[in-house]
A protein has these predicted regions:
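Central cavity-lining transmembrane alpha-helices of secondary-active solute carriers
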Residues: 21-35, 307-320
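Extracytoplasmic gate region of multi-pass secondary transporters
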Residues: 188-214, 225, 263-318, 377, ...
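C-terminal transmembrane helical hairpin of 12-TM major facilitator-type secondary transporters
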Residues: 332-380
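Helix-breaking motifs and short loop linkers at transmembrane-helix boundaries and internal kinks
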Residues: 10, 42, 63-69, 80, ...
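Conserved MFS/SLC helix-loop-helix module at the cytosolic interface between two early adjacent transmembrane helices
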Residues: 29-68
Length: 473
């Protein structure tokens, strides 16, 4: 949709990129608190309201007349989607606790890929015939129906949450002193990021995107630091914070502390940010690339790109999940290996996709790129779930969404747009994507050194906590 939106609203490539980042930044910042709400209250309700909000915002985007209006709609879409992935994957983890977990999450990822590609496909057809505004409207309406279906989801093994009134009273009793104490790291890091951004603004020739990136990175580090301090306190039932969260974190004190001190998560978070930069940067600019470089119409882009990307993405998510689970049965690093290898193998294929001039090769290269780039969809989330106690799975997945998107693909669309504006060549700008994807795959593979030990520690902790609970009963 980039090209018709650009013509209608008279936008630059950098502004187009920021439309993507509005969605990603808000999604990133909202994922962690919504993940916590899902763990504390109800994952089903987080999913239901999330689907409703992002569907309504998508529909509203069709009536936007100015850049800031469309920017706001995209931000609301990000807020709606923020709680969906952590809560959904946590519910899947409740149903699939054994060796088929990566495959189950892979099927979930297939649904997301299917919806995304079909949205591009049908959206292109609708935009060609009726305009991009109607494409937004028609893509948003079905989600409102799906929100009603989501309200029927059933969660397993959930303890009833404390009454909302009791929770609010506890939060009020703690007062602003407790809030200030807990979020001080966030304020410090965000302040440093803002100061650096302001310093860069004093120099001519440095684009504002870099200042925004510094502020975003500082904020994400501050949130991670805050969670590092807050969660271990919250799980201690003897503290005031523990009185609020005890219903969700009951008997998982040692496990929750372990989550935030697990080396595997460090490599997964860092590598996840890089591969998210590569994947979503490609998704954001692929249609515009095909229109500008290869001269395809909006409708043909939807068909050409949609068919090949859908086939590759679905096959890659299924094959990656199945392969990871098979390898995991023989070796603890199977899921990590599958996640990282897809990007190491996929980077040269993606580079060839961007450099090829013959359209006869373009379709197969799209298929191969998406096939390899979607191996990680199920396995990477499964690795996180493997080293995280069940009571805080949605919270930790929310933290992963926060960091990977804010430090990853929140930067990709505007940075590619900025490089395209400066070089005058979108192809050259997009070659950054496979390079970052390759680096991210290599970083993920470093977790092969630590994942077996981390899984054993969490498994032994879970057995210890379960045995202790049985003894007390």
């Amino acid at each position: 949709m980039f090209e018709p939106i650009k013509r209608d609203l008279h936008l630059s490539d950098a502004q187009l990129g920021w439309l993507g980042s509005a969605y990603i930044i808000v999604l990133s910042l909202s994922a962690l608190p919504l993940g916590v709400i899902g763990d504390l209250r109800s994952r089903r309700l987080v999913i239901t309201w999330g689907v409703a909000v992002w569907s309504a915002a998508t529909t509203a985007g069709g009536i936007a007349r100015q850049f800031w209006q469309l920017f706001t709609c995209r931000a609301l879409v990000g807020f709606g989607e923020a709680g969906y992935a952590p809560a959904s994957q946590a519910i899947i983890a409740q149903y699939y606790k054994g060796r088929r977990r990566a495959f189950a999450i892979g099927i979930y990822s297939v649904g997301m890929a299917l919806g995304g590609v079909l949205g591009i496909w049908f959206g292109g057809v609708i935009a060609e015939r009726y305009g991009w505004r109607w494409a937004f409207i028609w893509m948003g309406v079905p989600g409102l129906v799906l929100a009603l279906l989501a309200s029927r989801l059933r969660e397993l093994d959930r303890r009833p949450p404390p009454p909302i009134a009791e929770t609010l009273r506890e939060w009020w009793r703690h007062g602003m002193h407790g809030v200030t104490h807990y979020v001080m790291p966030l304020a410090i890091c965000a302040g440093i990021g803002a100061a650096l951004a302001g310093f860069l603004s004093l120099f001519e020739g440095i684009p504002s995107q870099f200042g925004t990136a510094l502020f975003g990175i500082g904020t994400s580090v501050g949130i991670a630091w805050t969670v590092w301090r807050l969660v271990p306190l919250a799980v201690r039932r003897t503290t005031e914070a523990g009185a609020v969260a005890a219903g969700a974190f009951d008997d998982f004190q040692d496990a929750a502390i372990l989550v935030l001190r697990t080396p595997t998560l460090i490599w997964i978070f860092l590598g996840g940010a890089m591969v998210t930069f590569a994947v979503n940067g490609l998704i954001a600019w692929a249609a515009a690339f095909m229109e500008r470089i290869h001269g395809l119409s909006v409708a043909r882009v939807g068909g050409q790109f949609g068919l090949w990307a859908l086939t590759g993405g679905v096959a890659g998510a299924l094959v990656g999940g199945r392969m990871a689970d098979r390898l995991q049965q023989r070796w603890r690093g199977g899921r990590v290996l599958t996640s990282g290898a897809g990007f190491v193998l996929g980077a040269p294929v993606c580079a060839a996709l961007l450099l090829v001039h013959d359209l006869r090769w373009f379709g197969p290269l799209i298929l191969a790129t998406y096939f390899l780039y979607t191996w990680y969809n199920g396995p990477l989330a499964a690795v996180i779930l493997d080293v995280v106690p069940p009571a805080v799975q949605a919270t930790v997945l929310g933290a992963f969404v926060l960091f990977s998107h804010l430090a990853g693909d929140a930067l990709a669309p505007p940075l590619i747009g900025y490089l395209s504006d400066r070089t005058g060549d979108l192809r050259t700008a997009m070659l950054l994507l496979p390079a970052v994807g390759l680096l991210g795959g290599l970083v993920i593979l470093i977790a092969l050194r630590t994942v077996a030990r981390d899984v054993r520690r969490v498994t032994s902790l879970d057995i210890h906590v379960s045995g202790q609970g049985e003894a007390e009963s």
